[in-house]
Amino acid sequence: MMRLLAIFISLFLFFPLSAQKKEISQARSDIKNRNNLENAESSMRELLKDSANKENIKIYITLADAIKTQYEIINEKFYLNEPADTAMFFNTLRKMFIAYESLDSIDMQPDKKGRVKLKHRKKNAEYLSRYRINLYNGGIYFVKKNNFNSAYDLMDSYIRCKIQPLFSSCM
């Protein structure tokens, strides 16, 4: 009887992990194919709502990559002079910065021996520092549109970059 109970418990513990891996895999596939990016983002955000996943760096990486790809698609449209939503461009940029800051905070967590190994910081900081000025430009854009809440959010993100540990090597 105890053996049967142990089997059931292990099965119930295994199925959520399997579903989580499947969602991450599907999201990565969507990112690679550059489609269903909003679904990939929302599924990663749903996984992060579960307290068991708060420390899973793979989810944060996938979330950041989904938002990064959304931003790059809109950015490509601007460079190709195709119609694109400017407000969405700047809001996606802000979401991207927030996602990478969250990823960095998880990356900074010490391991079991108390050591901190920053695997992603340098690459992410270099990538984001190229687009930091667009936070400022987005703030100006929203001021001109009289959307002061969004302008404040973007300007605040621009200024906070100076104190974010993620950007300590770039500034």
Question: How would you label these PLM feature ranges?
Answer:
Residues 30, 36, 43-47, 60, ...:
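Alpha-helical solenoid repeat scaffolds, predominantly canonical TPR units
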Residues 54, 66-145, 153, 160-170:
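Short coil/linker segments at helix-helix boundaries
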Residues 1-29:
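Bacterial Sec-dependent N-terminal signal peptides
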Residues 20-88:
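Start-of-domain marker
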